[in-house]
Each structure stands twice: as C-alpha cells, then as structure tokens.
Amino acid sequence: MDLIKYFTFSMIIFILGIWGILLNRRNILIMLMSIELMLLAVNLNFLVFSVSLDDMMGQVFALLVLTVAAAESAIGLAIFVITFRVRGTIAVEFINSIQG
C-alpha cells in the first residue's frame, strides 16, 4: 500500500473542496457540498493512516466524522428548504439578511 498516492489523492480532494468554497460564494448548496468533499478527504486520511499504523482509532474517528457529516447535511438541507419556501431563493446574500 503506497501511502503517498492515497495522501496525494486526499489532498487533491481537500483542495477541490476549498476551491469550491472560494470560487462559488453565491450558491450555499454548492458550498455545503464542498464542505462535505473536504470531510471526505479527512476521512480518507483517517482510514489510510489507520490501516498503515494497524490502529483502529482512525476508523472509529472516520465513522464519527461520517455520522456528524450526515447530521450536518440533513440539518443544512432542511434549513435550505425552509429558506427557499419563505424567501424563494437560497442565495448567500439573502441568507445573510435573516434576523430573529
């Protein structure tokens, strides 16, 4: 198992996630997908180093991150649906003006 290949692949995925956030500042849904891409890269790092070090803690952390990411996505998508129903858009400019 070549760690450099997996680490490079994970780094590319993480950079693509950062790039997606920085390039697209208007659509909040694409920003959420980019954050999920970054979490995927972190999970891949946890799993690769867990297998290479013969330690189960990396796999446990990866499962923990997956469950938190699933909950985050569900809550975020629910907020987006409610915002779209009330305002008619999920653009970042209009979400920033929400008060209350």
Swiss-Prot record:
Membrane topology: Multi-pass membrane protein
NCBIfam families: PRK05715.1-2, PRK05715.1-3, PRK05715.1-5
Family membership: Belongs to the complex I subunit 4L family.
Organism listed in the record: Arabidopsis thaliana
HAMAP family for this protein: NDH1_NuoK (MF_01456)
Main function: Core subunit of the mitochondrial membrane respiratory chain NADH dehydrogenase (Complex I) that is believed to belong to the minimal assembly required for catalysis. Complex I functions in the transfer of electrons from NADH to the respiratory chain. The immediate electron acceptor for the enzyme is believed to be ubiquinone.
UniProtKB keywords: Electron transport, Membrane, Mitochondrion, NAD, Respiratory chain, Translocase, Transmembrane, Transmembrane helix, Transport, Ubiquinone
Lineage start: Eukaryota, Viridiplantae, Streptophyta, Embryophyta, Tracheophyta
Catalytic activity: a ubiquinone + NADH + 5 H(+)(in) = a ubiquinol + NAD(+) + 4 H(+)(out)
Pfam families xref list: Oxidored_q2
GO biological process: ATP synthesis coupled electron transport
GO cellular component: mitochondrial membrane; NADH dehydrogenase complex
Documented EC number(s): 7.1.1.2
Keyword Translocase: yes
Cited PANTHER family: NADH DEHYDROGENASE SUBUNIT 4L-RELATED (PTHR11434:SF21), NADH-UBIQUINONE OXIDOREDUCTASE SUBUNIT ND4L (PTHR11434)
The protein's name: NADH-ubiquinone oxidoreductase chain 4L
Transmembrane residue ranges: 3-23, 28-48, 62-82
Domain of life: Eukaryota
Oligomer status and interactors: Complex I is composed of at least 49 different subunits.
Alphabetized InterPro entries for the sequence: NADH_UbQ_OxRdtase_chain4L/K, NUOK/Mnh_C1-like
Entry's localization field: Mitochondrion membrane
Any GO molecular function: NADH dehydrogenase (ubiquinone) activity
